[in-house]
Amino acid sequence: INWKAILGKIGKAAAAVI
């Protein structure tokens, strides 16, 4: 599992929502 990629996607999603 590529945690950095997952966290990156979550970070982008959060940034888009905020």
Swiss-Prot record:
The keyword Membrane applies. The keyword Membrane applies. Expressed by the venom gland. GO terms for biological process: innate immune response. Keywords: Amidation, Antimicrobial, Immunity, Innate immunity, Membrane, Secreted, Target cell membrane, Target membrane. The modification Isoleucine amide is found at I18. Belongs to the MCD family. Mastoparan subfamily. This is Communis-AAAA. The lineage of its organism: Eukaryota, Metazoa, Ecdysozoa, Arthropoda, Hexapoda.
